């Protein structure tokens, strides 16, 4: 019983072996171009099963399994079952030749002898209308040393941006091509901005340039008030009423024996600086000369409470009045505010003096110190210069300071605005009944 099973298995194995061999033979006959010979015969591979030997024939491949030697011959396939040896396939050649690197069947994209396509991409040294990759002049982008009409990447000259050392009509990025775009890197001639060490960039050069920052600016408004019930400016000198001078008007002495304006009796030296029609002409403010500043109070001399309101008589105008004002010194203790209104935020005080330094009354020589409330009046700036009332603005110099403005340098621009004079009842927006002159002071400081 056991012998029958073994015999059945051997028969089945033999049938399977022959079926597989026949199938392999059919497949090898279908692909004759890749047929290789095994052994020394002109047939195919021999297969041996067991100790049997395959005879030489003119058939197809022989297969050897085991230690048997299946020889290739011109006969039919020999198959042996046993301890035969199968020979290793040798290096024989079939009828079909494989393509090698020496012969190119068509256009090869590489380093061979094939020509580059005219409309495609060129990776060799040829010239194409597409992108040129390599050293050839392509009409597209040149990558490497080629000259492409598109962007040039590398050392080529492309009409697009040149990346590297190429000369591209676009932006030159890298080691210096002549690109019409921005030159980024080691210098080309780019028409855009040159970033880095670019040589001839017609755009802006971003590098080690230095730009000057703006000055430190400070703006405040100074309110100079003449007369009224609460003046901030007081005249301390006037012209000399000396008949020996024969009408000549030298610089002043303290307010007292002044030439009367209304043909009245000159006031004596004991008037204690009272404001009346004998010394009103000497009260010229920062706004310049004003003829219509005197109220006609029944020709009375003491008009302190009513001065100055533009509702009465007029002082003499012309050169005589201007000459009377020449040399008048006025001390000030003006308020500094944030805005042009007198009631706006208080910044500090301006203390000093100004002198009517022009015979026509159009300029004031000023020297004052602006002290600021924010630091407990410890921070201050000193100014000196000439304020001209006949021009739109004047420049005076900064003469140092204290606190955080110590050793300050710079200048200030002064603009004068003559405020409306009047009583508090008639003009409630005014906080004074005197003649107010507003000076806008814009300070430019450097340290």
Swiss-Prot record:
Residues 1-21 form the signal peptide. It is found in: Secreted, Extracellular space, Apoplast. GO terms for biological process: lignin biosynthetic process; suberin biosynthetic process. InterPro entries: Allene_oxi_cyc_Dirigent (IPR044859), Dirigent (IPR004265). Residues 86-107 have a biased composition (Low complexity). Pfam families: Dirigent. Disruption phenotype: Increased root suberin accumulation characterized by an increased aliphatic monomer content in suberin. Reduced day time transpiration rates and increased water-use efficiency during the vegetative growth period. Decreases in the accumulation of Ca, Mn, and Zn and increases in the accumulation of Na, S, K, As, Se, and Mo in the shoot. Residues 74-85 have a biased composition (Gly residues). Residues 74-123 are annotated as: Disordered. Dirigent proteins impart stereoselectivity on the phenoxy radical-coupling reaction, yielding optically active lignans from two molecules of coniferyl alcohol in the biosynthesis of lignans, flavonolignans, and alkaloids and thus plays a central role in plant secondary metabolism. Regulates suberin accumulation in roots. PANTHER family: DIRIGENT PROTEIN 10, DIRIGENT PROTEIN 24-RELATED. Belongs to the plant dirigent protein family. This is Dirigent protein 10. It comes from Arabidopsis thaliana.
